[in-house]
Amino acid sequence: MKYEKDKNWMKIALKYAYYAKEKGEIPIGAILVFKERIIGIGWNSSISKNDPTAHAEIIALRGAGKKIKNYRLLNTTLYVTLQPCIMCCGAIIQSRIKRLVFGANCNSSDHRFSLKNLFCDPQKDYKLDIKKNVMQRECSDILINFFQKKRKNKIHICKKI
């Protein structure tokens, strides 16, 4: 039952990833849910905003904070199509969300840290429930296709020169 709910919310986050892709951004989407309602939405916008912090998660958290007029986003669930980077993990810690659900795993160098170490240290006051690999195939495919297309375009540009 809970997995089906997670899947339904992830489908919405995935729609925002497709929106980011249409805008020429890295296709990552995020939503923040509180009591079965979306209170924050985000998609990667770093390129269009010329802002390295404009990740989907950050935008969703900022929007939610403004909406509820509090930077503490207690008892919320963040759905994101890709495992958060370390910057976004810092924002998750500061906002005190209760649960993180993500789709695709990331093996790039800026993701080579342990979510377990960040969020599940028994000596820390803050604990985060993490569910990974929800709609992993769909969340991975959009990224793989996006970067394959980018690489093809680079090859064509290089051949013209």
Swiss-Prot record:
EC id: 3.5.4.33
Co-factor note (free text): Binds 1 zinc ion per subunit.
PROSITE patterns: CYT_DCMP_DEAMINASES_1, CYT_DCMP_DEAMINASES_2
GO molecular function terms listed in the Swiss-Prot or TrEMBL record: tRNA-specific adenosine-34 deaminase activity; zinc ion binding
Annotated residues for binding of Zn(2+): H55, C85, C88
InterPro entries the record matches: APOBEC/CMP_deaminase_Zn-bd (IPR016192), CMP_dCMP_dom (IPR002125), Cytidine_deaminase-like (IPR016193), tRNA_aden_deaminase (IPR028883)
Keyword set, alphabetical order: Hydrolase, Metal-binding, tRNA processing, Zinc
Residues in CMP/dCMP-type deaminase domain copies: 4-116
Cofactor list: Zn(2+)
Top-level taxon of the source organism: Bacteria
A Pfam family matched in the record: MafB19-deam
GO biological process, one term: tRNA wobble adenosine to inosine editing
Residues of the active site: E57 (proton donor)
Record-linked SUPFAM superfamilies: Cytidine deaminase-like
Reactions catalysed: adenosine(34) in tRNA + H2O + H(+) = inosine(34) in tRNA + NH4(+)
Free-text function comment from the UniProt entry: Catalyzes the deamination of adenosine to inosine at the wobble position 34 of tRNA(Arg2).
Subunit-structure text: Homodimer.
NCBIfam families: PRK10860.1
HAMAP family per the UniProt record, alphabetical: tRNA_aden_deaminase
Family: Belongs to the cytidine and deoxycytidylate deaminase family.
Protein name (Swiss-Prot/TrEMBL): tRNA-specific adenosine deaminase
UniProt organism field: Buchnera aphidicola subsp. Acyrthosiphon pisum (strain APS)
Gene from which this protein is expressed: tadA
